[in-house]
UniProtKB/Swiss-Prot annotation:
Gene name in the database record: mal
Pfam families linked to this entry: Aminotran_5, MOSC, MOSC_N
EC number: 2.8.1.9
Protein known as: Molybdenum cofactor sulfurase
Note: Was named 'Organdy' because of the color of the translucid skin.
Length: 822
């Protein structure tokens, strides 16, 4: 039984969640990545901009004065004022950090090279902090990195400068107020110890023997999103932050807060932009910096409209968040998010498979017993019944299927990731050499995770969000009978100042789902024994829409089958729409009529519409418009097919302002190859010209699926994999061993296995989402979401000009050991 404190009253939570009705059934659990903006905030910003005229502050005094007022309001939010701190607007946390290191004076005297100060950073910092070391090296500063445990031990030790030498350099230490990796809160009450030299013993020997002046750079970006930074109680020299982390808006705007008594050490800023000088000669090396400190650092025109929106951001947050804890909205948010994360932690802590194996491996530095040490963040990985890890990419696909937004990977915190995953420096380098890159989907190497799953809560999250997430975990990943659980919600009783209200009891009853035991993820591939035929040809004229099934034969073009994925639907922002965002797309079923030379679009309940196939490029460019979009990071040149079909598609998919785009004939998108290999042209398909599906493997998979709710027959299940070439043979899985394929008179090269995502969980007849077959694919292939093989066209075997591939053609498969199977 989990006993928790409910912070925000149910009625208040209803008002808060109504601000985010646009989420629909999406469960957003990535507040550490970005806070969501409330609806009324955007409305109020819009109204403010429509009724006022804001000009460049270099031109308009009223705008400049308003910005100064907002500067004061932001400082007040952190319980300080302009007499103690100066606020410098930046483009974000990263620029704020960079501004400090670029301007920091490590040597007290420019001629004293021997006593240059040091740059000290915690190994578990965000990448943006670690990157500062490169600039510190350029300034001849000693660079020192400190491990997590060492840092905590040292900074909690009281120190006092005792050396008789007082001419040491200036030292800068950078650490986060809260880890963006797992939400651990680093001590803020130790700043005085740092300034008194508790880190001296980590410097070079000759620097240990002299007194250095220490300055603290606090990365507060993750902390201020859900916690109260009280600069009246703790006073770091420099604080960096981004406003979208707090308010959800605006992006591209941050701040550097500089303690007034530490301004003098930021004296080495070299570049100066518009608005930062009092006098300048362009024909002589002469300029005078602004007298007002923050004006020296805000190069060029400020992002004044974004800054002005901060007034509405503050007003909105103070309006919609009740002041439950210490009469403070940020304290309220802190407690609210902490108890949500603690609830999730408690539920996952006891989650086990049927054989007793723990299903969760946590990566924490606290146990959620102390809110001063932990934020509303939980980081972990999933473990299978046999003790092996489930890759975060596999998890991500399932989360997407359930409309749950989370963050996976290392979260730009290599140090924390390395420490918690127990990876050596050699391990990290070996992973890179094996092909793993930051931000990619390579989640397991040698069965070891390369990253983790991070859940983070905002003030708009509820216990229902926790339930939805836990139910997804139980349904998809835990081989166990879900237990009935009770959660007791108590009213919060920390201090007499807090407003009390009656609690209630909510019962969480998780679904009981039958799960198959995974005995062995090693797949036995049977030997080839019988013939193979091409059973069916399918093309998908419009990317991510329904299939056009061909009964006889079809022409092979330079990019794949003719008319296969030659069109795509784009949103009003130019981004390609797929079934992941709109499952109704599968019910748009194109037909290619070669006699009439048209493509006919069909959709249930709508009159079909046709568009011509053979308009010349000149005609299309005359009547349509040339446009650009992206498919799998590739820029695509396309032709807009006009308003009539655009309106038809928009009505069918119930999304406004959609457009149908046809790939331009002179678009040269190609298959990613090594430099010395011939590049094959690609249509709008994701990764290859053709996708082959073996029906025997589909049948094998169907027999492995044990979910009683999944009722697809063999043909419907095959349709989910959206293959171009559907083959029939007796053996399952053998296609995974092929090197190349000869179908009739045409040779194809195997380009690898097809990676799968939640698209296969969309019923191609109805657009409904299911958990299967992705879950079983992951189970059977050890977490590797691969099904089907990619092919590229080589040419005809007899060197003829024949370009027609016919159904029921015989197939010869060449195995990886060069044996030919028939």
């Amino acid at each position: 039984m989990t006993v928790l404190s409910q912070i925000i009253k149910p009625d208040d939570m209803i008002k808060i969640t109504s601000e985010f009705a646009r989420l629909g059934d999406r469960c957003y659990l990535d507040n550490a990545g970005a806070t969501l903006y409330p609806k009324s905030l955007i409305t109020s910003i819009n109204e403010d901009l429509l009724k006022n005229v804001y000009m460049n502050p270099h031109t308009d005094k009223n705008t400049k004065d308003y910005i100064e007022q907002i500067r004061c309001l932001i400082l007040k939010h952190f319980n300080t004022d302009p007499s103690t701190y100066t606020l410098i607007f930046t483009s974000g946390t990263t620029q704020a950090l960079k501004l400090v290191i670029e301007s920091f004076q490590f040597m007290k005297n420019e001629d004293d090279d021997l006593n240059c100060g040091s740059f000290v950073y915690l190994e578990d910092n965000h990448t943006s902090v670690v990157g500062l070391r490169e600039l510190a090296v350029d300034k001849d500063a000693e660079v020192v990195h400190i491990a997590h445990e060492d840092f905590l031990n040292v900074i909690n030790t009281k120190a006092k400068q005792t050396s008789k030498y007082t001419n040491g350099g200036n030292c800068l230490v950078a650490y986060p107020a809260q880890s963006n990796f797992n939400g651990f809160k680093y001590p803020l009450n130790c700043i005085e110890n740092i300034k008194n030299g508790c880190l001296n013993n980590h410097l070079k020997k000759h620097l240990c023997e002299i007194n250095s002046d220490w300055y603290v750079l606090l990365d507060a970006a993750a902390y201020v999103a859900t916690s109260k930074l009280d600069l009246a109680k703790v006073q770091p020299d420099f604080v960096s932050l981004s406003f979208y982390k707090i308010f959800g808006f605006p992006t591209g705007l941050g701040a550097l807060l500089v303690k007034k008594s530490s301004e003098n050490v930021l004296s080495q800023k070299r570049y100066f932009g518009g608005g930062t000088v009092d006098a300048l000669l362009s024909n002589e090396h002469y300029h005078i910096k602004r007298e007002i400190f923050h004006e020296r650092f805000e190069d060029g025109s400020l992002s004044f409209l974004s800054i002005i929106s901060l007034k509405q951001c503050l007003d909105t947050m103070y309006r919609i968040i009740p002041r439950i804890i210490h009469d403070d909205i940020m304290e309220t948010i802190s407690y609210h998010t902490f108890y949500l994360a603690k609830d999730l932690y408690c539920q996952l802590l006891d989650l086990r498979h049927r054989n007793g194996t723990k299903a969760i491996k946590f990566y924490l530095d606290s146990d959620f017993s102390d809110i001063t040490k932990q934020g509303g963040v939980l980081t972990f990985n999933l473990v299978r019944e046999d003790g092996t890890y489930i890759g975060f990419s596999e998890f991500q696909h399932m989360a997407d299927l359930f409309n749950i937004s989370v963050r996976t990977g290392c979260f730009c915190n290599s140090g924390s990731c390395q420490r918690h995953l127990h990876m050596s420096n050699k391990d990290m380098k070996d992973m890179y050499n094996a092909g793993h890159r930051c931000g990619d989907e390579v989640d397991l190497i040698n069965e070891k995770p390369t990253g983790a799953i991070r859940i983070s809560f905002g003030y708009y999250n509820t216990f229902e969000d926790v339930d939805k997430f836990v139910n997804m975990i139980c349904r998809c990943f835990v081989n166990a009978k879900a237990r009935k659980q009770k959660r007791i919600i108590n009213h919060f009783v920390e201090t007499p100042k807090i407003k009390h209200y009656n609690g209630n009891v909510n019962k969480i009853i998780n679904e009981q789902i039958y799960f198959k035991n995974v005995d062995d993820v090693l797949i036995n591939i049977p030997p080839m024994s019988t013939k193979i035929i091409l059973k069916e040809i399918c093309i998908f004229p419009i990317k991510s829409c329904g299939a056009f099934k061909i009964l006889s034969g079809w022409n092979i073009g330079p990019k794949g089958f003719e008319y296969d994925r030659e069109w795509m639907i784009v949103k009003d922002n130019g981004v390609c729409l797929t079934q992941k965002q709109n499952t109704r797309m599968c019910m748009i079923r194109p037909q290619i009529d070669l006699k009439q030379k048209v493509m006919i679009l069909n959709f249930p309940g709508k009159t079909p519409i046709s568009i011509p196939l053979e308009n010349s490029i000149n005609e299309v460019q005359k009547n349509g418009s040339l446009c650009h979009s992206k498919v799998c990071t590739d820029m695509i040149k396309g032709i807009d097919c006009g308003d009539e079909v655009a309106d038809w598609i928009s009505e069918a998919l119930e999304v406004s302002f959609l457009r149908l785009i046809r790939q331009s004939s002179n678009d040269n998108r190609s298959l990613k190859k090594k430099k010395d290999e011939d590049k094959k042209l690609l249509s709008l398909s994701n990764q290859a010209q053709y996708l082959l599906i073996n029906k025997a493997t589909v049948k094998w998979l169907s027999e492995k699926i044990k979910d009683p709710l999944f009722t697809d027959d063999l043909n419907h299940l095959t349709d989910r994999f959206r293959g171009n070439l559907i083959i029939e043979m007796e053996q399952e899985l053998l296609e995974r061993e092929w090197h190349s394929v000869i179908i009739g008179n045409h040779e194809f090269k195997v380009e690898g296995q097809c990676p799968r995502c939640q698209m296969v969980c969309i019923d191609q007849q109805t657009g409904e989402k299911t958990v299967e077959p992705l879950r079983t694919i992951a189970e059977q292939f050890g977490g590797k979401l691969r099904f089907g093989i990619y092919l590229s066209y080589v040419g005809t075997v007899n060197k003829s000009d024949d370009r027609t591939l016919k159904t029921y053609s015989p197939i010869k498969a060449i195995l990886n050991d060069d044996n030919i199977s028939r």
